[in-house]
């Protein structure tokens, strides 16, 4: 296909805004084939597109050799990329904004979840008479890891109801069987986690949900707008140095997003595509957790336009030293890579 000089200049100019012009005008050769991705709670449905991209070979199709390191929570995964042991994080959208407030420039470049997919509830054993948020005062609340998005939902909920983060004790319980055990055995009074943990605890009768962000409707009501969730993000310096590698990562995640959408009426296919350990020995509960979270998965990897503004409001309520005036939300996300991925894979 021939490209006119005007078209070339337009394309190069648009790419230049992100420092990507060289990637557009050259052959798409990967700058790096080996990519280390850090994630906090890989088996969670929150990160299902990452696992699908891995298990179905989408990363390999792009010429990538991806290694994935799993941590106890998103905050730990973030520390890995900041510390240099990982290149990219599969983590919460708002983490890039929090980093920018500290003078570190990271950018979300492809979306996995368009809702936080987090359920916050109380133990039916320790808090059988729960009636209002005030009952949480002095209680032990389990989150995947302190500072993670599960922690953010707790603090946001507390702030909305006149409580402070210091009114409760936050305890890291991870994102798997350990989290389930912590609630069932009474080590914690409440829990904020994602599926399949939340659905498993609901299914066993151990959890009463008080906040649910697994659907777009509930998410918008709680946060006052779209609140993007799981993304791939990395430093702006990494994007500038490896735009083709970043594009390849986005391609793989967009394909995974679209594959998940195509299986909405075939949850067995999704359950069969993930490692058996994800099922926690209960395939039916895992499929029920998928059903509860289906609305929250991104259909195309595109970040909603109002997502950054919503994240700013959430962080202002969640992080004590976060100053909205010191950040530029437009610099913490881009849809350029996801757009090109959709052009390359319109049907997944």
Q: Can you say where each PLM-predicted feature lies in the sequence?
A:
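Secretory targeting signals
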Residues: 1-3
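Short, solvent-exposed loop/beta-turn-alpha elements that line the ligand-binding surface or hinge
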Residues: 61, 128, 215-225, 295-304
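Conserved C-terminal helix/tail region of periplasmic/extracytoplasmic solute-binding proteins
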Residues: 309-348
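Extracytoplasmic/secreted proteins, especially bacterial periplasmic and envelope-associated proteins
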Residues: 48, 54, 76, 80, ...
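Pocket-lining segment of extracytoplasmic ligand-binding domains
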Residues: 178-181, 185-276
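N-terminal export signals
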Residues: 7-26
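Secondary-structure end/capping motifs
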Residues: 239-322
């Amino acid at each position: 296909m021939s490209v006119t000089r005007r078209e070339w200049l337009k394309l190069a100019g648009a790419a230049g805004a992100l420092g990507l012009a060289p990637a557009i005008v050259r052959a798409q050769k990967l700058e790096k084939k080996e990519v280390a991705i850090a994630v906090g709670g890989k088996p969670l449905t929150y990160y299902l597109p990452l696992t699908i991209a891995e298990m179905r070979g989408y990363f390999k199709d792009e010429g990538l050799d991806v290694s994935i390191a799993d941590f106890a929570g998103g905050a730990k995964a973030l520390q890995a990329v900041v510390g240099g042991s990982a290149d990219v994080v599969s983590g919460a959208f708002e983490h890039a904004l929090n980093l920018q407030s500290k003078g570190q420039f990271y950018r979300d470049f492809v979306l996995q979840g368009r809702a936080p997919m987090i359920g916050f509830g109380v133990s039916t054993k320790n808090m059988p008479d729960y009636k209002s948020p005030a009952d949480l005062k002095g209680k032990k609340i389990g989150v995947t890891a302190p500072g993670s998005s599960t922690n953010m939902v707790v603090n946001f909920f507390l702030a909305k109801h006149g409580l402070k983060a210091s009114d409760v004790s936050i305890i890291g319980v991870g994102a798997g069987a350990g989290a389930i055990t912590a609630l069932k055995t009474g080590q914690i009074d409440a829990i904020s986690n994602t599926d399949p943990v939340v659905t498993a605890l609901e299914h066993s009768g151990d959890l009463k949900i008080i906040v649910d962000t697994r659907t777009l409707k509930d998410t918008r009501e709680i946060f006052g707008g779209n609140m993007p969730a799981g993304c791939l993000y990395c430093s702006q310096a990494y994007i500038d140095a490896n735009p083709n590698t970043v594009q390849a990562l986005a391609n793989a995640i967009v394909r995974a997003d679209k594959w998940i959408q195509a299986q909405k009426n075939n949850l067995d296919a999704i359950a069969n595509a993930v490692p058996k350990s994800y099922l926690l020995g209960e395939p039916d509960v895992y499929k029920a957790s998928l059903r509860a979270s289906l609305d929250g998965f991104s259909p195309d990897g595109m970040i909603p336009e109002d997502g950054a503004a919503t994240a700013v409001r959430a962080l202002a309520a969640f992080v004590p030293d976060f100053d909205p005036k010191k950040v530029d939300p437009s610099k913490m996300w881009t849809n350029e890579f996801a757009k090109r991925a959709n052009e390359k894979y319109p049907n997944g």
